[in-house]
From Swiss-Prot:
It comes from Loxosceles rufescens (Mediterranean recluse spider). This is Dermonecrotic toxin LruSicTox-alphaIC1c. Disulfide bonds join C45-C51, C47-C190. Keywords: Cytolysis, Dermonecrotic toxin, Disulfide bond, Hemolysis, Lipid degradation, Lipid metabolism, Lyase, Magnesium, Metal-binding, Secreted, Toxin. Pfam families: GDPD_2 (PF13653). Its main location: secreted. GO terms for cellular component: extracellular region. Its cofactor is Mg(2+). GO terms for biological process: killing of cells of another organism; lipid catabolic process.
Length: 273
């Protein structure tokens, strides 16, 4: 999965997919009542990027729906996964459940079109704070009560705070999550970071007894870091330059080992070589 980083305006969806991304990451900010408000990152952000692209959240969802609905004039067949980077740092811990509820209602109406030929992409809810695990329950309970529990098959999870893996597992246990788990590791492209924790996450993924199904590393903009990540065995790479990742994947060392994921590749299945 080549994951376009910080795709916060509708125009950027086309831009990143056309550069080679089959997945995008979108920032979601919340208002004081825990309603998802904007797709917006703000300053500071990654070096070399404009931090100020934004849409109203529901407008972005409608644009995303068009980009992931077969038959639509804006449809991109290869856009198959969306990571919502949920900026819950502005919320109190006791608002996490409400945030999940409101997020689910917005997605149900504006992305899934109330279950009537909505967008088809898989969705990862990425939460920065382990204490906000109740967001997951709020989201799931809402889809169930609205009669759309089937859509949970399209939803996965990530805790993005670079916490110790056992602590992440414990948060999932409290949230009642047993699958559909992506594990991120990384830091802004302005700073270096080793692959030490990525390797721990990959070991958990491959152990057969861990909770992690997929591992992605962010933010990777250089060919050398891309190669290091692929050598470590990641499933996804988040990048500001999808074309760089696509280039490296076509190199002789990688083109027979890796391929770009398609809609038929279940993002919740742990890959076994």
């Amino acid at each position: 999965w080549i994951m376009g980083h910080m795709v916060n305006s509708i125009a950027q969806i086309d831009e990143f997919v056309n550069l080679g991304a089959n997945s995008i990451e979108t920032d979601v900010s919340f208002d004081k009542q825990a309603n998802p408000e904007y797709t917006y990152h703000g300053t500071p952000c990654d070096c070399g990027r404009d931090c100020l692209h934004w849409e109203n959240f529901n407008d972005f969802l409608k644009g995303l729906r068009k980009a992931t609905t077969p038959g639509d004039s804006k449809y991109h067949e290869k856009l198959i996964l969306v990571v919502f980077d949920l900026k819950t740092g502005s919320l109190y811990d006791n608002q996490a459940y409400d945030a999940g509820t409101k997020l689910a209602k917005n997605l149900l109406e504006h992305y899934w079109n109330n279950g009537n030929n909505g967008g088809r992409a898989y969705i990862v809810l990425s939460i920065p704070n382990l204490n906000h695990y109740k967001l997951i329950a709020g989201f799931k309970d809402t889809l169930k009560s609205e009669g759309h529990e089937d859509l949970l098959e399209k939803v996965g999870h990530d805790f993005s705070g670079n916490d110790d893996i056992p602590d992440v597992e414990n948060a999932y246990k409290k949230a009642g999550v047993t699958g559909h788990v992506w594990q991120s590791d990384g830091i802004t492209n302005c700073l270096p970071r080793t692959l030490k924790r990525v390797r721990l996450a990959i070991a958990n993924r491959d152990s057969g007894s861990g909770i992690i199904n997929k591992v992605y590393y962010w933010t990777v903009d250089k060919r050398s870091t891309t190669r290091d990540s692929l050598d470590a065995g990641v499933d996804g790479i988040m990048t500001n330059y999808p074309d760089v990742i696509a280039d490296v994947l076509s190199e002789s060392a990688y083109k027979n080992k890796y391929r770009i994921a398609t809609y038929e590749d279940n993002p919740w299945d742990t890959f076994k070589a």
